[in-house]
Each structure stands twice: as C-alpha cells, then as structure tokens.
Amino acid sequence: MNQNIEKRLFTSESVSEGHPDKICDQISDAILDEVLKQDKNAKVACEVFATTNYLLIGGQISSTAIVNYEQVARDVLKKNGYVDDAYGINANTCKIDIKIESQSPDIAQGVELSNDQIGAGDQGIMFGYATNESKTYLPLAITIAHELVYNATSQRKKGLFKWARPDMKSQVTIDYTNINNPKIDTILMSIQHDPNYNETEFKKYIKENIMNLVAKEFNLNTDFKVLINPTGRFVIGGPQGDTGLTGRKIIADTYGGYSRHGGGAFSGKDSTKVDRSAAYMCRYVAKNLVAAGLADKIEIQVSYAIGISQPISIFIETFNTHKVDLNTIYKAVYENFDFSVSSMIKTLDLKKPIFFKTSKYGHFGKKDLPWEKLDKIEVLKEYKKCS
C-alpha cells in the first residue's frame, strides 16, 4: 500500500441495468411513468424487492390511473434478459406479489397546500454537484464507470460479448496526482458469465473491447491496472446471487462519492418527494453556475420540512474554485432560481413520464433530461461583471 503514498487516487463504481438493485429501480420508475402517463398529479412511492424467481412490489400510490404493475415488472425483466430459469429469475414464470396502498392522509394534507403551492412530501437534505472536469459536468470516475457497464451491456445485447450475462459492475480509480492531467490508475469489472466459458478469451475481450475502448473515448491512458472477476468465477448473479432493492445504489446514481449525499433515494418517487425533485434542481443550478464560469466545482445543499414549500436552507460550496465572490454566487442563485416545490416541478417539467431513463447508468449527465439543460448561462455570466 505504501507504493501509493505519493498518489492521489479517487474511486467510483457503477452497475449495469441487469444488476439486481437496478432491476428494482427500473421497475419502480417504470411503474411511476405508467401512472404519470394517465395521471400527472399522482402521488407515487413505489419500492421493489427481488430475489430468486420472486418480486415484491410495495408502497403507496394515490392515483386515478389503472396500471398492471405485474406486467410492467415482467417487461422490465425481459428487457434485461431475464427469461431463462438458469439466470435465477424468469420474467415469464417468477412469482410477483403486489402490496400497494394509498398515500397516508396525514402526508397528503401537507403536500396539497393553498394558492397552488405544494408542500414538501418529507423533511430531508439534498445535494447537487457539477464540475468542469468532464463534458457532462460530472466527475471523471463515475462517468467512466457508467460508460464501462453501459458499453458492456450494449455489446451483450447485440450478441457481440460472448458468454456474458446481465449482472455487471465496474469500478474506476482515477489518479489525480497531477490535477491538470488525471489518468486512469485501475479498472475493475465483475461480469456475470455462462458456466461453460473460456476465461482467458473472456477477460481478453473485456480488456481490449470494453476497457481500452472506453478509455480511448475519454482520450485517456490504456496502461492502467486491470482486475476482472477477481474471485475467478461469476456464474450465479442477478437477484439469485444477491437480493435487489429499490434505492440501494444512491452513490452510483449521483456523483460516485465525489459529492456528498443526503441519503434519500430517487427511483419510484413522484416529484412532490423532494428527495428527487430538489436533488435534480440542485444539479441543474450547480451545472449552470459552473458552465457560466462562476466556479470550477460547485456543490449545493438544500433542506426541507414536510408540508412547507420553500427550503429551510441553501448552502453553496465551491471548494475554493470560485472565480467571483461567494456572496455573488449566492446572489445569482437567489435571484434566478426558485427552490419552492411547485416551481421546481414546473421548471424541470417533472410531471412528465421521463423517469425510467434515469433508473440506469446515473440520474445525471444525459443531455435530454431537463435538469441537464444549460439555459441560464448568459444571465449568470453577468454576475462575473459585478463581483
């Protein structure tokens, strides 16, 4: 370990859409989207548990929508390749229990306020982050980690990745010793495979056609340390190898540990749940501030009380990278962004059924998501003139 004492190494991980926790996230968000297609004002909190050939769908949904929850779940399993008993869960035959109730009236009375205002669905703290170290304004490690499992899954679905099964994980260590010239130190991938496979050929394919390919996409080095299935064998995976649960990949969903996290998960929750809407809003604000050149890195924390529309607090951290006075950044935020629940929902168009696409490979960095838009850059640049 002493050999790394002079290095500055940071690591993030991601998982594929076939990972058991991500299966649950996808089902939760697929149900949310199906409900929102029929009822944009629905209140949804949907959780999923997955194990060997079994799913439990539970939570609270108050809506006029009529949705076949079981069919939605089976469709998600099919999309991820779970159609074979050998994989531990079969979309066509697995048992599914539904335990859905209505939202508590005690919570409902705090959400629907007068004057078209919406109260926060719960108390809590949320964070959003942006950095200029990548084109997506996300930290490098999590960006590469997502791309690795996305690429591997895409090749598996196209039939190019021999022996690969749906369950995969990636882990990327970035060497920041030279802060202006980061490089990849280590890539770890654990990829489920068929029992009868050629280990040497399998690992060679991963290194040459996934790891090296992704590294080159980011114009980074390919002489990194490589770890592939370190235990030597990964046949039993998916919900059979490890139970899945909605909301258990909150760090991979966000910034890979590079920024703080308030603890609240996203998937399966409608936008009155500030765990989701406020985290998206914080990302939107931070990204626009960084893109406007007010700082190289920005993290925003907000807090809410149940039943109250406006945030209790807003805190901004720039890690000493701000290009203008910190008070100027606060001024820019307060004058241009409204963190009330109803305003966040309107600004980010959060009543639309857009959430399934967030349930895999991160909730941030995808250009077509409304909280990734850069529509405040010009107005924010004006604050550089008055600092």
Swiss-Prot record:
Mg(2+) binds at residue 21. GO terms for cellular component: cytoplasm. One of its GO terms (molecular function) is methionine adenosyltransferase activity. It holds the Pfam family S-AdoMet_synt_N. GO terms for biological process: one-carbon metabolic process; S-adenosylmethionine biosynthetic process. PROSITE patterns: ADOMET_SYNTHASE_1, ADOMET_SYNTHASE_2. Pathway: Amino-acid biosynthesis; S-adenosyl-L-methionine biosynthesis; S-adenosyl-L-methionine from L-methionine: step 1/1. It catalyses: L-methionine + ATP + H2O = S-adenosyl-L-methionine + phosphate + diphosphate. K(+) binds at residue 47. CDD domains: S-AdoMet_synt. Its main location: cytoplasm. L-methionine binds at residues 103, 242, 273. Homotetramer; dimer of dimers. This is S-adenosylmethionine synthase. It comes from Mycoplasma mycoides subsp. mycoides SC (strain CCUG 32753 / NCTC 10114 / PG1). The lineage of its organism: Bacteria, Bacillati, Mycoplasmatota, Mollicutes, Mycoplasmataceae.
